[in-house]
């Protein structure tokens, strides 16, 4: 009976994982500085940019992209929700160094659609990482591609990166 309980426990714990792919790991040095006029590093993301507000894309700007970069990618994840992908935007131009709306090429997010999914934590405080990757070449990934395909392409072409982290707190649950 004890072996059966241990086996059931191991199976339950294994089921708590995530099918979300890991973020790019070989992204070059963290030389890019990402900022937002809506929130500071580590600060609360205003309600306007969450599911309880309008759900707008927060305005982002960045500096420090190497001159050799041919394109930029932007990945927004919630690491507190097993790397839930809120947005994967690819092959953005290197100039202007800003984004405040939809991108021409977007991979599917964890919701299964393209585009921005605003933060909506079920309970507690969640961290949202807005990471900009400088790419040595456009990824060539098609709009609507799977997240894993896009992340592999970013990993292959990233020469530098930088992250801005904001938080959203919820008392629901």
Regions found by a protein language model. Give the residues of each.
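N-terminus-centered regions that define maturation/targeting leaders and the start
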Residues: 2-6, 12-173
């Amino acid at each position: 009976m004890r072996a059966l309980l241990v086996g059931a426990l191991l199976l339950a714990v294994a089921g708590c994982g995530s099918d979300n792919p890991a973020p790019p790991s070989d992204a070059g040095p963290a030389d890019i500085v990402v900022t937002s006029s809506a929130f500071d590093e580590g600060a609360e993301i205003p309600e306007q940019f969450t599911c309880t507000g309008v759900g707008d894309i927060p305005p982002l700007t960045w500096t420090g992209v190497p001159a050799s970069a041919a394109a930029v990618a932007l990945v927004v994840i919630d690491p507190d929700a097993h790397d839930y992908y809120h947005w994967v935007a690819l092959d953005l131009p290197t100039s202007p160094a800003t984004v405040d709306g939809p991108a021409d090429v977007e991979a599917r997010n964890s919701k299964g659609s393209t585009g921005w999914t605003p933060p909506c934590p079920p309970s507690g405080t969640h961290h949202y990482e807005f990471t900009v990757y400088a790419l040595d070449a456009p990824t060539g990934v098609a709009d609507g591609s799977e997240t894993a395909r896009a992340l592999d392409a970013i990993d292959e072409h990233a020469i530098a990166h930088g992250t801005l982290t904001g938080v959203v707190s919820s008392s629901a649950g």
